[in-house]
Amino acid sequence: MRICSDQPCIVLLTEKDVWIRVNGKEPISLKANHMALLNCENNIIDVSSLNNTLVAHISHDIIKDYLRFLNKDLSQIPVWQRSATPILTLPCLTPDVFRVAAQHSMMPAETESEKERTRALLFTVLSRFLDSKKFVSLMMYMLRNCVSDSVYQIIESDIHKDWNLSMVASCLCLSPSLLKKKLKSENTSYSQIITTCRMRYAVNELMMDGKNISQVSQSCGYNSTSYFISVFKDFYGMTPLHYVSQHRERTVA
């Protein structure tokens, strides 16, 4: 039986002993009540037996949110080897939770609460694989088709770091010139991405009690508070203080 998904990643749960074959290679045996995490994009996946209701479909956005949630320095994560079979397997400890997560992953989220519930359930499924040393590498590999996403993930994994183009390119095993070229083809640039990352972080910091503009500026990697205010105003159309006051007015209203 061939597995198809319009998402880059799936996690399946077995009800009985099965085998899984990826791209025609030697089949991998999987016992009952085991999970397999697979990269679906550009891969042919066959399984000897499968209950379609026990497949969780995981989108690029969920992967990006999950890597951000882990708060790891992604620059230290080894690159996934292209020659490796893109699959991780392990026993399932909470099959009932998995069933609910799989069900939600196939349902359109009609409300914000349903969207957040699905997100939380899929995070729970993914977290089972955290003990695997290759897990985060495989997650990053699944974002490879969009280089800008990978750059966002690397910078946001340690926003305080003094990043530059060469450092990020090295994390992706690319030359700085090739990274610039790839980002340009995606209608963005390194400077746009790092500014967006810093501004997102700045807003979160500003909403925390006790954080002043100078502290937020430094935590976002800016040595000059006045320059930080200028960049913030260009990005959001208002100064940091104006942004905070508007947010508080909306909250009170």
UniProtKB/Swiss-Prot annotation:
Ranges of residues in domain HTH araC/xylS-type: 149-246
DNA-binding region: 166-187, 213-236
Entry's Gene Ontology BP terms: positive regulation of DNA-templated transcription
Pfam families: HTH_18
GO terms, molecular function: DNA-binding transcription factor activity; sequence-specific DNA binding
Induction comment: By acidic conditions. Forms an operon with upstream adiA but not downstream adiC.
Matching PROSITE patterns: HTH_ARAC_FAMILY_1, HTH_ARAC_FAMILY_2
Classification via InterPro entries: Homeodomain-like_sf, HTH_AraC, HTH_AraC-typ_CS, Tscrpt_reg_AraC-type_HTH
Disruption phenotype: No change in arginine-dependent acid resistance.
Keywords: DNA-binding, Transcription, Transcription regulation
Protein name: HTH-type transcriptional regulator AdiY
Source organism (scientific name): Escherichia coli (strain K12)
